[in-house]
């Protein structure tokens, strides 16, 4: 495994294994949570880009081909809804999953996020299954 820094400042770990075609952007300012999520997704065969802030996530989203985004709601520089709104302006077709200690918020019904998952209660297999469903329902590039 090698760690590669992208021009946007985000990083990607390259595993020596067959990869699914989807690239997932994970945005979380908690390093441990970000690493655990990256490991889960990489183990499932996804290419994973990690960003340690909302602003870095937006920069990465603009500069890399992204198939889905998983982001934390509560971050220091911007909250998950602010980030999701900016991402939707750039490309509204990319599925967005928000992880939140607050559970589902009203904004989900307004189309900001495709899915809300309560942090601490998330089942890794549930996250992978829902991600796969969202990717399958996504319009082709």
PLM features: what roles do these ranges have?
Residues 75:
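Receiver (REC) domain active-site loop signature in two-component systems and cognate sites
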Residues 21-32, 37-41, 69:
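Conserved acidic segment of CheY-like receiver
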Residues 1-23, 125-141:
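Non-catalytic signal-transmission and effector/linker regions of two-component phosphorelay proteins
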Residues 52-56, 79-83:
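Acidic catalytic/metal-coordinating carboxylates
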Residues 72:
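Active-site residues of response regulator receiver
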Residues 45-52, 60:
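Short hydrophobic/Thr-rich beta-strand motif most characteristic of the beta2 strand and flanking loop
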Residues 62-64, 86-93, 111:
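Conserved phosphotransfer cores of two-component systems
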